């Protein structure tokens, strides 16, 4: 049995009225639902693709204006924290949109991870629909109030030691750290990376790990522990 969509309830939650309600219905239609009900003309996948770009643009613009002195690297990593699946899941929860998702009975959403993915995709699809129907302005008006305030965003930048080190060297020395990765093997012979971090040509820290990303974090953490008295 196909389900009906309470368009007015969703529009009330979004504070946006669709000129073309079919866009909203498409945004709510999970691919698994269309598989069970072929009469559903289109599923949400294309709108998800568009909505992902809309979300990224709005969040990028918001951070750009909110933090005028922030460099590109920190802007990028902070944006990533605000547009990932977990963040989008939280935004969907805030708007209570999940209950409107049209999803097939056979689709597994028992796991928390499955629910996060489905709800994140739903948010992106709805943003894509809003953008097509009304442009960027209403999409912005939906997204920005969902974002953390400035004081809550700041810690997101500093969770990663690489971000903290970059902020520290820029503030104190007006330079960026550089990383050099070398092949490395652990005691059991597993391949990995030996990463060195340099500031002004001086070696500040080293890290050893199975992945280059983790080795860079460890090197940055060591650099902070020896050069930043606040850490």
Swiss-Prot record:
InterPro entries: dsRBD_dom, RNase_III, RNase_III_dom, RNase_III_sf. NCBIfam families: RNaseIII. Mg(2+) binds at residues 48, 121, 124. It comes from Chlamydia trachomatis serovar D (strain ATCC VR-885 / DSM 19411 / UW-3/Cx). This is Ribonuclease 3. Digests double-stranded RNA. Involved in the processing of primary rRNA transcript to yield the immediate precursors to the large and small rRNAs (23S and 16S). Processes some mRNAs, and tRNAs when they are encoded in the rRNA operon. Processes pre-crRNA and tracrRNA of type II CRISPR loci if present in the organism. SUPFAM superfamilies: dsRNA-binding domain-like, RNase III domain-like. The active site is at residues 52, 124.
């Amino acid at each position: 049995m196909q389900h009906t969509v309470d368009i007015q309830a969703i529009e009330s939650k979004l504070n946006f009225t669709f000129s073309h309600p079919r866009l909203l219905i498409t945004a709510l239609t999970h691919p698994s639902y269309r598989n069970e009900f072929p009469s559903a003309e289109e599923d949400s996948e294309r709108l998800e693709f568009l909505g992902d770009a809309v979300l990224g643009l709005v969040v990028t613009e918001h951070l750009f204006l909110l933090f005028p002195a922030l460099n590109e690297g920190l802007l990028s990593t902070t944006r990533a924290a605000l547009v990932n699946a977990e963040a989008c899941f939280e935004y969907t929860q805030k708007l209570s949109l999940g209950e409107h998702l049209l999803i097939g009975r056979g689709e597994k959403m028992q796991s928390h991870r499955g629910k996060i993915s489905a709800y994140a995709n739903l948010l992106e699809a709805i943003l894509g629909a809003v953008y097509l129907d009304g442009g960027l302005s209403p999409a912005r008006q939906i997204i920005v109030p969902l974002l953390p305030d400035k004081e809550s965003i700041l810690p997101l930048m500093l969770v990663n030691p690489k971000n903290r080190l970059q902020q520290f060297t820029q503030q104190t020395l007006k330079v960026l750290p550089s990383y050099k990765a070398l092949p490395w093997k652990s005691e059991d012979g597993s391949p990995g990376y030996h990463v060195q971090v340099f500031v002004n040509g001086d070696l500040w820290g080293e890290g050893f790990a199975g992945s280059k990303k983790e080795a860079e974090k460890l090197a940055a953490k060591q650099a902070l522990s020896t050069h930043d008295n606040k850490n």
